[in-house]
Amino acid sequence: MLNMSSDQEPPCSPTGTASSMSHVSDSDSDSPLSPAGSEGRGSHRPPGISKRDGEEPMDERFPACIRDAVSQVLKGYDWSLVPMPVRGSGGLKAKPHVKRPMNAFMVWAQAARRKLADQYPHLHNAELSKTLGKLWRLLSENEKRPFVEEAERLRVQHKKDHPDYKYQPRRRKSVKAGQSDSDSGAELGHHPGSQMYKSDSGMGSMGENHLHSEHAGQNHGPPTPPTTPKTDLHHGGKQELKHEGRRMMDNGRQNIDFSNVDINELSSEVISNIEAFDVHEFDQYLPLNGHGAIPADHGQNTTAAPYGPSYPHAAGATPAPVWSHKSSSTSSSSSIESGQQRPHIKTEQLSPSHYNDQSQGSPTHSDYNTYSAQACATTVSSATVPTAFPSSQCDYTDLPSSNYYNPYSGYPSSLYQYPYFHSSRRPYATPILNSLSIPPSHSPTSNWDQPVYTTLTRP
């Protein structure tokens, strides 16, 4: 907005700069300045032109006498002096840019701006542009006629001078448009990408390496709700993903994407519909063992989605890096963490196999590194579990008899309603949940072993 008066007026009121130049820059094609501005700047240089009618007294409210003066100026003005600004930023290039012919408003604005800038150098160009636009809309057809005629003459002259002229939009503007396009493209590309991650392995079990990486620095994997920056840019995509995740839940509940589902929604939405499931249908998807120290690996969101292929990686004793990048740490780690904070919400925080491991508290399995499927009553080592897991060797159908789904007679035998989360059982749950976030290694520490033997034996 540093235009013709940049050398003589202090920018006093920067308000409205962007919008006020819109009238002018619409028909301008070269520089960010209006032709009125750039020519105005150049017009101070040729002697005898700049202060041509500056002696007339004018009111700041632009009365009708100004319009008459401007039209008089236009009638006697030599337009051949105008086209090239003498000292413009990019005015004198090797190949000068051909501007579009001015329309009637530009003719009016250029002459009036020059006149007013000479008269009132303190007027900010933005305010000037705004007022010129308002005045132009108030002009009658009769008052506009001289400007329209001048614009028509300029158009004909322009056509003569540049017979093969083609309008090319300002390069700066096109870069801006491309930039915003690429921005939105990146945003759109980013969200489907993370959606692909989440739907691809959204219900896959959570590797403890992801839990560690989240606690350590949250540096890889798709963005999770705890780490996603709460910006407007991601907000729309996140809402969209939330609806998409909900749509997936409604669609036969293929995979519940916990990263985009608020835990409060989950408690009402998922739990209210959870009775519709056959709990035995879930059993083939339950992980047999995760990594020893963090049974939160068993906190997989166990839905009926066939994610068997991703479990063998998760079930190994060592975290598989391929799986860790592919699986969604967002899906269950957030629900695990919220499980640690709010143990009373009866969602899929910790899976049955984990509670079976601890509620039976069977000391016969001395190898706590493997957690190898005590539900199957077999000491399969963690090396063989990946091959054994997707198959139906480990069938939990006999578990209700061994108090697997219903360890306490007072509670309904539903997959997700564990007494550990009720207030009467809170003392049993809190040592587990507190210990989940503590041990970072693959071998249990003493502060975890003790609660298993002392507080979690079966009543």
UniProtKB/Swiss-Prot annotation:
The protein's name in its UniProt record: Transcription factor Sox-8
Major localization class: nucleus
Species per Swiss-Prot/TrEMBL record: Xenopus laevis (African clawed frog)
GO cellular component, as recorded: nucleus
Region annotated Dimerization (DIM), chain positions: 56-96
Binding region for DNA: 98-166
Record text about domains: The transactivation domains TAM and TAC (for transactivation domain in the middle and at the C-terminus, respectively) are required to contact transcriptional coactivators and basal transcriptional machinery components and thereby induce gene transactivation.
Record-level GO BP terms: enteric nervous system development; morphogenesis of an epithelium; negative regulation of transcription by RNA polymerase II; neural crest cell development; neural crest formation; peripheral nervous system development
Organism placement in taxonomy: Eukaryota, Metazoa, Chordata, Craniata, Vertebrata
